[in-house]
From Swiss-Prot:
Annotated GO biological process: fatty acid biosynthetic process; negative regulation of fatty acid biosynthetic process
Domain HTH tetR-type, first and last residues per copy: 10-70
PROSITE patterns with a match to the protein in the record: HTH_TETR_2
Its job: Represses the transcription of fabB, involved in unsaturated fatty acid (UFA) biosynthesis. By controlling UFA production, FabR directly influences the physical properties of the membrane bilayer.
Protein name: HTH-type transcriptional repressor FabR
């Protein structure tokens, strides 16, 4: 990559980070202005268009980055699990760390999941589906269950995790610790339920084949 391309990528990165920094519990992406983001990034508003077509393209890039960041962290968690440790507890801890370190990234996913923009809703749905698919892949590999079972289990787990994540954004450290424990219990109940449901279905098949 040449010097000019590196500088362009650096400026593009600055715009993304500037937009993230302006999000908060009180401020959504829809309330951001191009001028504010450009000023925070240290560039002229007219220079913004060298990097993004419009503010919506910037927002969609932020959604993609947020989803990718979360998936990468969860992959790292699964690598740690491979070396020993509780699958569910390690995953929950990693997820809560992500929210603690990147609250605005998670807020963006939550808000735009049910926002007014169809493009944003589709982008968030796509990221969540990636998340579900990767978890289903892992469960299928580890638990040796059919894809239909692991997808249903993964979808239930992700739904509960995202709901807990929304709650975690606005509570203190002790409440978050209690939330983590509750989330671990809920996910274990889903995992146990999926396993016993699968066992029951297998027993039915075996009985019919006799």
């Amino acid at each position: 990559m040449g010097v000019r391309a590196q500088q362009k990528e650096k400026t593009r990165r600055s715009l993304v980070e500037a937009a993230f920094s302006q999000l908060s519990a009180e401020r959504s992406f829809a309330s951001l202005s191009l001028r504010e983001v450009a000023r925070e990034a240290g560039i002229a508003p007219t220079s913004f268009y060298r990097h993004f077509r419009d503010v919506d393209e910037l927002g969609l890039t932020m959604v993609d980055e947020s989803g990718l960041m979360l998936r990468q962290l969860m992959r790292q968690a699964r690598q740690r699990i491979a070396k020993g440790g509780s699958v569910i507890r390690t995953s929950v801890s990693t997820f809560m760390e992500f929210i603690g370190n990147n609250p605005n990234a998670f807020r963006l996913l939550l808000r735009e999941r049910s926002g007014t923009s169809a493009a944003f809703r589709a982008a968030v749905a796509r990221e969540i589906q990636h998340f579900i698919a990767e978890l289903a892949d892992y469960l299928e590999l580890e638990n040796h269950m059919p894809r239909a079972f692991t997808e249903a289990q993964a979808e239930a787990m992700v739904t509960i995790v995202f709901s807990a994540g929304a709650e975690a954004l606005d509570i203190g450290a002790e409440q978050r610790r209690q939330l983590e424990e509750r989330l671990v219990l809920q996910l274990r109940m889903i995992a146990k339920g999926a396993y016993y449901w699968y066992r029951r279905e297998q027993e039915k098949i075996a009985q019919h084949s006799e």
